[in-house]
Amino acid sequence: MSEQNNTEMAFQIQRIYTKDISFEAPNAPQVFQQDWQPEVKLDLDTASSQLAEDVYEVVLRVTVTASLGEETAFLCEVQQGGIFSVAGIEGTQLAHCLGAYCPNILFPYARECITSLVSRGTFPQLNLAPVNFDALFMNYLQQQAEGEVEGVEQRQDA
């Protein structure tokens, strides 16, 4: 009789927490006297690390910068962390889980922190649109593949 692989896929959220939080309004109070037509820039970054067997930490960093002309109205950064149990998932499925699925879970928490910080800074309400982490992850994979292809071509020319 042959032995079958009975590894079941399992996913569980162990904890979601705010790892780091920062809010700066470097040009207050002068910025409050200007017309509020900001340019808002959103930067996202994710990182993951293995804590134990089948246990991973995923950190989503969200940075929002609002500028009025050359002046920064506010800069807000939140690092939203999560600890996830992920069993029976390997390779590209694991990479997708940690690079897209987990950030999708963390983003609403980070968005709420940012909204609260901006409000406490007495700036107009900031509503961050949902982010398609699946598309961002696929774009990342495509860039990685193109980088590897370019690297191979360069090595062949050398």
From Swiss-Prot:
GO terms of biological process kind: protein folding; protein tetramerization; protein transport
The keyword Hydrolase is assigned to this record: no
GO molecular function list: unfolded protein binding
GO CC annotation, single: cytoplasm
UniProt keyword Cytoplasm, yes or no: yes
Subunit comment: Homotetramer, a dimer of dimers. One homotetramer interacts with 1 SecA dimer.
Official protein name in the record: Protein-export protein SecB
Organism annotation: Yersinia pestis
